[in-house]
Each structure stands twice: as C-alpha cells, then as structure tokens.
From Swiss-Prot:
NCBIfam families membership: glyS
Lineage: Bacteria, Pseudomonadati, Aquificota, Aquificia, Aquificales
Principal place of residence: cytoplasm
Swiss-Prot/TrEMBL catalytic activity: tRNA(Gly) + glycine + ATP = glycyl-tRNA(Gly) + AMP + diphosphate
EC id: 6.1.1.14
Molecular function via GO: arginine-tRNA ligase activity; ATP binding; glycine-tRNA ligase activity
Class of this enzyme: ligase
Complexes and interactors: Tetramer of two alpha and two beta subunits.
Subcellular location: Cytoplasm
Stated name of the protein: Glycine--tRNA ligase beta subunit
Length: 678
C-alpha cells in the first residue's frame, strides 16, 4: 500500500481561505484518487490546515490503477462491412487509429443502431505518473478567493507559497508551481523552533511521518484536533472559574484558523464595564480581539480567554498586553454608550434621510416608510390590530444606525436600538421588535418571539427582496451582496415557523419575485429532508401561501408511508395524465352517466367534495388526503370498467369532465403527475 503527501507551505492564510480550501482538498482527493484506493475507508484521506500550511495525506493506494475493459464504437456496421462481409476502408481506418487487431472487431448493438467496434483492455496508469500529471493541475482548481501575485510566475494564491512537499512514500514527486519546486522539507512552528520567524526546516523521510513530525515541531496540523484543543481549554478554564462557556462555533473556528499551537490565557477586565450591555462586551471581544467570554447565571463575569499561537514563557507579560488592548476598546464602547444615552432615538429618525440605502432605492428613511406601508398591510392581512404600535416600532427600527455605538460596531444594529429605547421608556414589545426585526440573520438563527417583531421582520425582508429584484439586482450563484437570498430564506422561515397563513400574492405583484421566494422554500424543504418529487408536485402549482405549501409537503410525505403508496400514486397520476391539455371543461351531466362505475364514482365525488374543501380551508391536509384515498377504489373500478375515449363525443367529454373535477380536487394539494412512483 502506498501513501501520498502534498503540503503547500504559505505565508499566513486568512481564515476564509483555510476553511474553504480544506473542504476543497478533501473532495478533490476523494474524487481524484478514487480509482487507486485498495478499499474505501474514512482513514484513506487526512486533511491538515493551519495558517501556514494546507496538506493532504492519502493512504491505502495501489501502485497502479486496475486495467479497464472499455468498448470503442466505430462507424455504422453497414458502412464498415461490405456486402461480401469484408471490412471497408472506414473499418480499417478505425482499427488502425485505435491500434485494434482486425480479429478484435465485432458488431455492437446500441440504442442508435448497429456499429462496428471492439472491447479492449486499457492498461491502468501508474500512481507515480498519475500524481506527476494530476497534482500540478490542482493548483489551478482551487476555488476563486481574493488572491495575489508575489513573483514573476503570474500564479495567484491568497498568500505567497514558500514550499511544497510532494512525497509518494519516501520519493519526491517532482513538479514546479509558482517558481517553487517540490521537495521533502517542511517548516516547523515559526516562533517555537529556530530560526525564529521562519521555523526549523525539517525533512520528511516518509509521507506517513507527517503528523508526527509536525506534532514534534509544535504544530497541531489537523484542523479538528486543534479546534478540539481550543474547546477543551475553554471548558477547562470555565470550570476553574466556576463559570460557563458561551457557545460560539464561528469564533472558535476563526481562532483555530489563526493558530498552529493554541495556548489559552485568561485575562481580566474592570467590573465597571459590566454596565455595558452584554452584547457590546461580547462584540468587542469577538470581532476586534478574538477573545472568548465567560458567564455565570446568564451574566458575564469580568474575565476573558485569549489564545496565543505559542507557549510563551512569561504569560503575565502577554496577559497584560491582551488586557491593555481590551481595556482601550471597552473604554471607547463605554464612552459611546454614555454619549448615545444623552440623545433621544426620535432625534435620529429625520437624519435617516442622510443615509443612502441604495442609489436606486433612496435613503434609509425611504426604506423605513416602505417597511411601514408593508407592515400595516401585513397587519391587516394577519389580524394584528395595534396600528399605532406598528407605526412607532417601524419608525424607531433603524434609528440606532446613527448612534455612536452602531457606527463603531455595526454588528450591534437593532441590539442597541432595543437597549436605548428601553432606557427612554418605550413599551417592551416595541423595544424588543427593534432587535427582532433583523431576525433571522442566518439560516440557523433564532426567529422573533413577539408578534410585533415578526411583523416588522417580515416587512423589512419583503421590502428588501421586492425592491432589489425590481431594480434588477438579483443575487449571483457565488455572491449575494445585498442579502436578497438570505432575506428570502428569512421570509420562508418566518412564515413557516411562525405558522403565518398568508398568500404572498396579496403583497407581491410580480411573479418573478414570488418564484424566487418559492425557490428558497424549495431549498428550505430539501434541507429538512423532504423528497424532491413531493416538493415539486406541490410547488409547481405556484400557490403563494408559503405556510400552506409547507403543510402540503408534510402531509404528502406521510402518504408515502402507506404500504400501497405506489399503487395509490399510479391511480392518482392516471387521472391527471388522461385529461388532454386543450380539453374544454363543462359541468358533469348526470344524465350521461350510463355505467354503474361512473355513477358510483360521481356519487362518491359529490359526497366528499364539500367536506374536502372544508379540510383544505382549515389547512387539515392529512384529512383531505384521507378523503382522496376514499375515492381510490371508485377510480379503480371506473378505469377497469369504463372506456373513456369512446366515439360518442358527449359521453367522452362527460367522463373527462368528471375526471377533471376530481383532478381539480387533487390540485388543491399537489400536481400528482409529478410524483415519482406508480
């Protein structure tokens, strides 16, 4: 079994590059080397990612690919063989071009007809040659991130590449990228081995030695191991302080990206800063210093945890340095807080006219007025009665953008508006809605707790999506600068998770915008594990009610659990498929129902129709589907015993009209013809 090691040594990579490239390397290694693995195992591929290195160790590799039998297709058989059964010039040319002995040529039948061809055995490529050919190509396939050039090679990468290790077992596989030739040496920790600043240059004798060599050189090369070390230290210090950690996987990931040998150091700050809102202290620590906080009984304690990238000898000096920097930041925050409290949020409302929302969409004040119009309309549609409370909350919702605190820490928008409005005596629901109207900020974020906050959040997100799409600012697959996709997902989550029965067509007059939001609902439903065919069957009907669409998908998914699901779907699909697209519907004429099965089917249809519609109106889709299941045996008998496409036009159209009425019931839930099965 062979092992291959690739290490790309760089100047300090930014966290985004580390997080992106480690996932890319894993997928690349899996796809590229899949024909060389002796057996499939998670241990076949190990990824290493630190600020100074990206590496992949691939184990359990064969020396060469297995030989493969492949079929080569040549000219059509009638062109390749003449009437006497001899090979024509076309056949001989095909054989010569592909180095195929004439006796190997044979007739091959395909879907497109008969051809001359041959089945040959292709020699598997050697692992060494494969690596030499394939790995240099990898360097041009990294995902596009902000990059730079640093020499005359014209190669671009987020940071300069300083060394490349390429080892097949103990042999260097030679190639060159960005004027850097592959070798067997790596560099150990920049500050814990000599020379300081560069780190000891260390030869790797065998690919499998990589992890041990880096570990002895004060490098935890494996990202997850390093992250685990950081979390373990955080939890350990919390126990020592009789406190709790504050879960923040994003920050811990970032610290993991900034260190090769993380060493935690607990620092202190003055309790006077605890007069600041909790979120302010956490924001200062997280976004400006990458410090972690501790809490006890839900309240912060005046301690923080910083991580050094090496085991410093004099921790007190480093600790004092961390504390000094944080003290200055918190002092600024306290000053901003006190200054902001001297002013009323109301004074900022008019000043929003001076903040541009977008050059084609006016000022932030214009945005607030649009939000207000939408919020009042949504309130009318959803039954929220207090219009004055809505007006007050919406007008204050963006006022904190002009506070000193939010100017300095824009992550605190909404949060500071909540605290400042509380201080100036606003109703609690209004204050909370100022914060909540930004929720959810991500696909995993919390949603608003209050009805007012939900209303404001929905209005704000709808305005953003509607406004930007109307001016042609659609998100690109790789970029969403105005947060349109994120806001659309927020709309979906609010409507589904707050169970809001709202037809978006009552607030959206552009089908392309509704389609965009429905596409986000599709993604949301897929993320919840629902089957694609069920989602398509429901969403293809273009119902503008997001919550009802969700309930329909949920109910249909339960139907899939029936033992005879396949048979049920086959019958329901047949109803929809048999009706011609250009069929002109007319009411069923009971006098034209001549056979017993069609009379019984119509009678059962009439029996359940009104009850079915009540279930649909009440969003009870499980019971509605139950009624449709009651129709199935009658539909079965109808199809088994009644000829539909008869010569008598009146009889034929009457039977099609009956099926059309039944299919219209089905389409209150889904287009069953789009379901897979049956």
């Amino acid at each position: 079994m062979k092992s291959y090691l690739l290490e790309i040594g760089c100047e300090e990579l930014p966290p985004k590059a580390i997080l992106t490239y480690k996932e890319f390397l894993k997928e690349y290694a899996h796809q590229t080397f899949k024909d060389f693995f002796i057996y499939n195992s998670p241990e076949n591929i190990k990824i290493y990612a630190t600020p100074r290195r990206l590496a992949v160790l691939i184990k359990n590799l064969k020396k060469k690919q297995d030989n493969q039998k492949i079929t080569l297709i040549g000219p059509p058989y009638k062109v390749a063989v003449d009437s006497e059964g001899k090979f024509t010039k076309a056949a001989l040319s095909f054989a010569e071009k592909n180095n195929i002995p004439l006796e190997k040529l044979e007739k091959i039948t395909t879907e497109k007809g008969e051809y001359l061809g041959a089945t040959i055995e292709k020699e598997g490529e050697s692992l060494e040659l494969f690596i030499k050919h394939k790995i240099p190509q990898l360097f041009n396939q990294f995902p596009q991130l902000k990059s730079m050039k640093w020499n005359n090679s014209d190669y671009r990468f987020p940071r300069p590449i300083r060394w490349i290790v390429s080892l097949l077992d103990d042999k260097v596989i030679e190639f060159e990228v960005a004027s850097v030739k592959t070798d067997r040496f790596t560099h150990l920790h920049r500050f814990m081995t000599k020379p300081i600043g560069r780190g000891e240059r260390k030869d790797i004798n065998h690919a499998n030695d990589y992890e041990e060599i880096t570990k002895l050189g004060y490098i935890i090369a494996n990202f997850e191991d390093r992250k685990h070390s950081i979390k373990t230290q955080y939890e350990g210090f919390a126990r020592q302080l009789n406190a709790s950690i504050i879960e923040d996987d994003e920050l811990i990931d970032e610290i993991t990206c900034l260190t090769e040998f993380p060493v935690g150091i607990v620092g202190d700050f003055s309790p006077e800063y605890l007069t600041l809102p909790k979120e302010v202290i956490i924001t200062v620590c997280k976004h400006h210093q990458r410090y972690l906080n501790f809490e006890k009984d839900g309240k912060l304690i005046p301690k923080f945890l910083a991580f050094s990238n090496n085991a410093v000898k004099d921790r007190d000096i480093v600790k004092n340095g961390y504390e000094k920097v944080l003290r200055a930041r918190l002092e600024d925050a306290l000053f901003f807080y006190k200054e902001d409290l001297k002013k009323k949020l109301d004074d900022n409302i008019e000043k929003l006219k001076g903040i541009q929302f977008h050059e084609k969409l006016g000022s932030m004040y214009d945005k607030v007025l649009r939000n207000l119009e939408l919020a009042l309309k949504l309130a009318d549609l959803t039954g929220y009665k207090d219009a004055e409370k809505i007006k007050r909350a919406v007008m204050l919702s963006k006022a904190d953008l002009l506070t000193e605190m939010v100017k300095e820490f824009d992550e605190l928008q909404g949060i500071m508006g909540m605290y400042y409005s509380q201080k100036q005596g606003e109703e609690e629901e209004i204050s909370k809605s100022i914060y909540e109207h930004y929720l959810p900020k991500t696909a995993e974020d919390n949603i608003p707790e209050t009805n007012l906050g939900t209303l404001l959040a929905l209005a704000d997100k709808l305005d953003t999506v509607i406004s930007f799409i109307k001016i042609g600012e659609l998100p690109k697959p790789s970029a969403d600068p105005f947060g349109i996709r994120r806001n659309a997902i927020g709309i979906v989550r609010l409507l589904v998770e707050k169970e809001i029965d709202l037809d978006l067509r009552k607030v959206i007059d552009d089908e392309s915008i509704l389609d965009f939001i429905l596409s986000r609902l599709e993604s949301y439903l897929q993320s919840k594990g629902y089957k694609t065919d069920i989602i398509n069957a429901v969403l293809s009907l273009k119902d503008g009610n997001i919550y009802r669409n969700y309930l329909k998908v949920k109910a249909l998914s339960q139907l899939r659990n029936l033992p005879d699901y396949e048979n049920v779907i086959m019958v329901f699909k047949r109803v929809g498929n048999i009706i011609p697209e250009d069929f002109k519907f007319s009411n069923v004429d009971v006098n034209l129902l001549v056979s017993q099965p069609e009379k019984e089917l119509y009678k059962k249809f009439i029996e359940i129709k009104d009850k079915f519609k009540r279930f649909i109106e009440n969003k009870d889709y499980d019971k509605a589907l139950g009624l449709l299941l009651e129709l199935k045996p009658y539909i079965d008998r109808f199809f088994d015993n009644v000829m539909i496409m008869v010569e008598d036009e009146k009889l034929k159209n009457n039977r099609l009209s009956l099926l059309k009425e039944i299919n219209d019931l089905f389409r209150n839930i889904a287009d069953f013809t789009k379901l897979i099965g049956g």
